[in-house]
């Protein structure tokens, strides 16, 4: 089994598994930021474009540069957001574009915990913001706030203890308010503030819950993909028994992200 590698390559599969929730969190994140209009934005790790689209629709930007190291994600986002205001680039956190005078706002959605060196990445972002500019990000609260993943890993590890190191909760200690605040403060940002952002995640049926785990994109789907058919069947059965549907057959859960923001000194 080689499920320790987080496979984030396939845009369509990501949309089914996580993208739909990412879009809703992106809206709440921007409502919290309340950014000034006509700003020049840089997005680090745009993925399939959930936050990119929200910035374009809700923040009235002058320009948006959205970058991601995955060519497949950049292609997916570019094809779904055809807008002259937005420029997509293939670039990682260690090779960020620059703008003369600096960007007004730099954001990163659901990315920081997957970076090899988050402190270096945040310092790099800070170095590309103008004085008085805003740096903000958000990550999933894997340890306590992502119910559909928390339940998945609880049952997966009960069946297969060797899966425990793949569980995003213990894997990503950065995804906690105190750790995020420390990360931003140590990067030299001022007025650092964290915020919880929570949405409902409703699945019409158990199959609607289970099917996205079969896409092979993301840590949990990558793990499922590594299992043989019998092991998948056992895990599916445990999850069905664990998840109590509502009277209409739907499964109603919640997902929480943790937002973090800070300013570059004027």
Predicted regions located by residue number:
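A generic alpha-to-beta junction signature in SAM-dependent methyltransferases
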Residues: 33-35, 59, 81, 129
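Conserved alpha-helix/loop element of class I SAM-dependent methyltransferases that forms part
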Residues: 20-39
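Conserved catalytic/acceptor-binding region of the Class I
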Residues: 119, 126-130, 134-204, 220, ...
